[in-house]
């Protein structure tokens, strides 16, 4: 970690006198504004601003409650992470330091908290490109190749390798932790000492003799096998990450497909994902919908539901229709495809949408009405009105427009306790907020349906006719 303090004119000329004055309280600088993180794939990229830049979700949260750094003028923190060994080197420069009332932030412990033992000095960092290149080869050699995709480049190939999180593989995971902390919001390192952890690595093998390393890690997934009563195993995807230089190339898709293949071949009970991001859920639902499109057991129930949405008139609310599959069908899907019930219900709505004519106003209104009823039931339950659940929009530090709270009101009690009465205007606001949630979910369904359509036109041809 290099610290560089730039000289000033006053320091260069001792005859110049500084004027005495009183400066204001140091406002500090946000870490997001002065810190950048790069990936270096070779020694030439180390220390270069031309390296691939990472986009951490939020660097501020590493620097105290307000996310600011104090006591530095024109502070710049540039960190390079080796794509070979995942060691890190930090270059820190500033013009001067001064205590403006908030102290001077000690940068070293904060960076060590992020990068741990990966953080080294520049000379050692440069040596890791040649000295550390074999350890990844050892991890890959000890693992099992699950999937092999020939690359468009003649000198390389992409493989997915399955390794147990112990020994060298556990050591590799520890080196990947800083990337997880930087790029996955709300993430925490897994406990690799716990039984049942393994990792799927997306690696690129180089056939070039001049390459400093035989393999590059493009991405990975950490999965956990845990007991399910009475005598089966569930598989949970805890973390999945494709490194920024290789995102958009389909590696995350390959990881999920490989996990699905493992779950079927080993008769896992089902597959779940721990706190998936919106984009990961988008990819997951697209994959599962494509699998379900060719799963014959769902077609009779799916076509029946599509037909009901075409024929029923829900606009006047004189009738109701629950857009749910038969319970035995959800169990069949779990047994054969290892899709858990919650995920299947999500995909079920997308499959129905795919089989409706978007130009048929009646069908689409009925579809939206079913989505509305489901969401209203999930949020408010069956008890609404003067004494029941209520949905209100609440400001938050994350998003003032899309955060809601649910609370319960009831009749009776002291007058002082009845601080909330549901007036007509309250019901109108609640209806508006419910519709906003419904609109958001409708947008998600439409986007996933578009992706499924673009990737599976041949599979859609054998679905229910519209």
UniProtKB/Swiss-Prot annotation:
Disulfide bonds: none
GO MF term set: histone H4 acetyltransferase activity
GO terms (BP aspect): subtelomeric heterochromatin formation
Coiled-coil segments: none
Protein family per UniProt: Belongs to the HAT1 family.
Annotated catalysed reactions: L-lysyl-[protein] + acetyl-CoA = N(6)-acetyl-L-lysyl-[protein] + CoA + H(+)
Main location: nucleus
Protein EC: 2.3.1.48
Site for Interaction with histone H4 N-terminus, residues: 197
Stated name of the protein: Probable histone acetyltransferase type B catalytic subunit
Keywords, alphabetical: Acyltransferase, Cytoplasm, Nucleus, Transferase
UniProt KW Acyltransferase keyword: yes
Entry GO CC: chromosome, telomeric region; cytoplasm; nucleus
Domain of life of the native organism: Eukaryota
Role of this protein: Acetylates soluble but not nucleosomal H4.
Entry keyword Transport: no
Annotated active site: 274 (proton donor/acceptor)
Name of the top EC class for this enzyme: transferase
Binding-site residues, acetyl-CoA: 240-242, 247-253
Intracellular or extracellular location(s): Nucleus; Cytoplasm
């Amino acid at each position: 970690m290099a610290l560089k303090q730039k000289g000033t004119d006053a320091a260069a000329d001792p005859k110049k006198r500084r004027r005495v004055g009183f400066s204001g309280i140091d406002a500090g600088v946000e870490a997001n504004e002065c810190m950048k993180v790069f990936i270096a794939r070779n020694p030439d990229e180390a220390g270069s601003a031309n390296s691939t830049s990472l986009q951490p979700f939020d660097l501020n949260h590493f620097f105290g409650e307000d996310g600011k750094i104090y006591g530095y003028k024109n502070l710049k923190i540039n960190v390079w992470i080796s794509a070979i060994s995942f060691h890190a080197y930090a270059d820190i420069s500033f013009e001067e330091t001064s205590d403006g009332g908030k102290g001077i932030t000690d940068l070293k412990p904060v960076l060590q908290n992020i990068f741990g033992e990966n953080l080294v000095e520049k000379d050692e960092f440069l040596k890791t490109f040649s000295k550390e290149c074999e350890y990844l080869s050892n991890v890959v050699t000890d693992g099992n190749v699950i999937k092999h995709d020939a690359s468009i480049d003649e000198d390389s190939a992409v493989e997915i390798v399955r390794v147990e999180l112990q020994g060298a593989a556990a050591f590799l995971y520890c080196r990947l932790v800083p990337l997880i902390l930087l790029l996955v919001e709300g993430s925490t390192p897994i406990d690799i000492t716990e039984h049942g952890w393994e990792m799927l690595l997306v690696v690129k093998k180089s056939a070039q003799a001049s390459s400093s390393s035989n393999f590059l890690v493009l991405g990975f997934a950490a999965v956990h096998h845990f007991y399910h009563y009475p005598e089966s195993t569930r598989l949970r995807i805890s973390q999945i990450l494709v490194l920024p230089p290789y995102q958009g190339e389909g590696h995350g898709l390959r990881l999920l497909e490989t996990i699905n293949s493992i779950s079927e071949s080993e008769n896992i009970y089902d597959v779940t994902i721990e706190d998936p991001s919106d984009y990961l859920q988008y990819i997951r639902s697209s994959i599962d919908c494509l699998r379900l499109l060719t799963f014959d057991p769902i077609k009779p129930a799916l076509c029946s539901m599509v037909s009901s949405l075409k024929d029923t008139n829900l606009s006047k609310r004189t009738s109701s229709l629950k857009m749910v599959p038969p319970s035995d069908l959800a169990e069949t899907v779990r047994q054969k495809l290892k899709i858990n019930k919650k995920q299947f219900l999500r995909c079920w709505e997308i499959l129905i949408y795919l089989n409706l004519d978007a130009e048929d106003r009646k069908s689409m209104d009925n579809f939206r009405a079913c989505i509305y009823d489901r969401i209203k039931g999930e949020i408010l339950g069956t008890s609404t009105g003067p004494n029941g659940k209520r949905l209100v929009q609440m400001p938050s530090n994350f998003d003032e427009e899309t955060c809601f709270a649910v609370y319960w009101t009831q009749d009776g009690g002291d007058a002082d306790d009845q601080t909330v009465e549901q007036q007509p205007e309250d019901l109108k606001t609640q209806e508006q907020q419910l519709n906003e949630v419904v609109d958001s979910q409708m947008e998600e369904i439409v986007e996933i349906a578009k992706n499924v359509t673009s990737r599976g036109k041949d599979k859609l041809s054998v679905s229910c006719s519209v």
